[in-house]
Design a protein with these regions (language model features):
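Short beta-strand micro-motifs within the conserved protein kinase catalytic domain, predominantly
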Residues: 54-65
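Internal "kinase-insert"/substrate-recognition segments embedded within catalytic cores
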Residues: 80-111
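An alpha-helical support segment within catalytic cores of ATP-dependent transferases
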Residues: 101-147, 157-158, 242
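Helix-rich C-terminal or lid/interface subdomains of diverse kinases
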Residues: 74, 181-246
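Conserved short submotifs of the Hanks-type protein kinase catalytic core
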Residues: 63-75
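The N-lobe alphaC helix and its flanking beta3-alphaC-beta4 segment of protein kinase-like domains
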Residues: 32-48
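Active-site acidic catalytic loop and adjacent metal/ATP-binding pocket
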Residues: 14-17, 132-177
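ATP-binding glycine-rich loop module of kinase domains
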Residues: 6-35, 78
Length: 246
């Protein structure tokens, strides 16, 4: 294996180019089960006919677990967002709406994962109980949810085709919760106006009621606390206080 160059560096993982292959090498925080789960999610999305890089193998590189996939040559929507925000937001929303209409393979339940993560936070017990109860009372749906649908996880290749990357958080559940997380991600990155535009665009393309997204936001934000870095966690807590959750 010839790791030609680094393509991307993310939290505790590094993505390398190996000829026509992409090698995602995970850091020590990821165990075997985490990596195999992500590879399985990606393979199931691929088998469902979604635009996903093929999983070629899972192995160990220099003592670290790695997923090897087809290399997609192109740019992420995050790289083009600044020069064409409206076009990127429209394209992103259309892709997520299409994703939620796709046949859903066997995946973990989103609501179970969300409840588990809310329970793991340091929020007051009464707040955790209330938020978990809200999750359980939301409509039960079985849509394919990416779980981390953001501009940096959508790549446009040389032919203009969009590909979905990073399937670690994939689950089945309410697409409105998935879209709410995308809105929250945009807002936490300082793109509040784009988050509002995205919500409107997604609701139009998917036929989702805007209120559904709004109702999911507090639970999505609370569940995000467990994996957020310090700065993002502070922003999430500030926002949860502003809307009266904490």
């Amino acid at each position: 294996m010839q790791l030609d160059r680094v393509i991307a560096v993310r939290t505790d993982k590094t993505v390398f180019k190996d000829g026509d292959r992409c090698v995602k090498v995970f850091g020590g925080a990821y165990d075997k089960a985490d990596v195999l789960s992500e590879a399985l999610n990606q393979a199931r999305a691929e088998e469902a006919g979604l635009p996903v890089p093929r999983v070629l193998e899972v192995g160990v590189v220099n003592g670290r677990w790695a997923i090897v996939s087809d290399l997609i040559r192109g740019t992420t929507l995050d790289e083009t967002l600044e020069r064409d925000p409206e076009g990127c937001i429209a394209r992103l929303a259309a892709m997520q709406a299409d994703l939620h209409r796709a046949p859903c393979p066997i995946l973990p339940r989103l609501r179970d994962r969300m409840v588990r993560r809310i329970q793991q936070t340091e929020l007051p017990a009464t707040v955790r109980y209330e938020l978990c109860a809200r999750v359980e009372n939301m409509p039960q749906k079985h849509q394919l949810c990416h779980g981390d649908f953001r501009p940096s996880n959508v790549m446009t290749d040389e032919n203009g085709k969009c590909w979905l990357l990073d399937w670690k958080e994939a689950a089945r559940g309410d697409g409105a919760a998935d879209a709410a997380r995308t809105c929250l991600t945009l807002r936490m990155s300082g793109r509040g106006s784009l988050a509002d535009n995205y919500a409107a665009c997604y609701c139009e393309k998917s036929g989702t009621d805007r209120e559904s997204l709004r109702r999911w936001l507090p639970m999505v934000a609370a569940a995000r606390l467990t994996s957020a870095r310090a700065q993002e966690r502070a922003l999430l807590m500030t926002w949860l206080k502003e809307i009266g959750v904490v």
